[in-house]
Amino acid sequence: MNTTPDGRPIPPAHADERTMLEAWLDFHRATLAVKCSGLKDDQLRLAAAAPSSMTLLGLVQHMAEVERNWFQRVFAGQNVPPVFGESNHDGFALKSGRGLDEAVAAWQAEVSRGRELIADAGLDDSGHLSEQEAGHVGDQGVSLRWIMVHMIEEYARHNGHADLIREQIDGTTGA
């Protein structure tokens, strides 16, 4: 597999649908990790710009929760609590004692668990939405294909946020 100079896996130009979806999802996961690399704890906690309180550390925590929600709760139908506790259901809230290492470990654990849950599933296999989520896309559930495309979109959107936050912190752009 080819990688970018910063170590992110380059998605193949030609592959079957499943391989392509997994590769793009992994590329965007790696992009978030790159955006957080080389920074000190206080930098990871810097908010983007008022009135937003979004931080790079909060984005990592949020994506851990997003991974858990879509692969464990929706696709596998598991009843699992929020990664960082009930009071932080979306993952954005920061805790003074939790730094990047702990947040990344939780995020990577959720990524690994998601991979396990979908390893033998087909792209047309369906997950089940909560009533709140069903209101957005309908009550027929969503296919694994839909979930993977949504996850790519979720990472791409938040990587754009991460790009702006990182540039504000130390001027680093790209990736």
Curated annotation (Swiss-Prot):
Highest taxon, organism lineage = Bacteria
* UniProt entry tagged with the keyword Amino-acid biosynthesis: no
The record ties this protein, via InterPro entries, to: DinB/YfiT-like (IPR034660), MST-like (IPR007061)
Would the keyword Ribosomal protein turn up in this protein's UniProt record? no
Q: What organism is listed for this UniProt entry?
A: Streptomyces coelicolor (strain ATCC BAA-471 / A3(2) / M145)
Q: Which Pfam families match?
A: MST (PF04978)
**Keywords tagged on the record:** Transposable element
This protein is called: Mini-circle uncharacterized 19.1 kDa protein
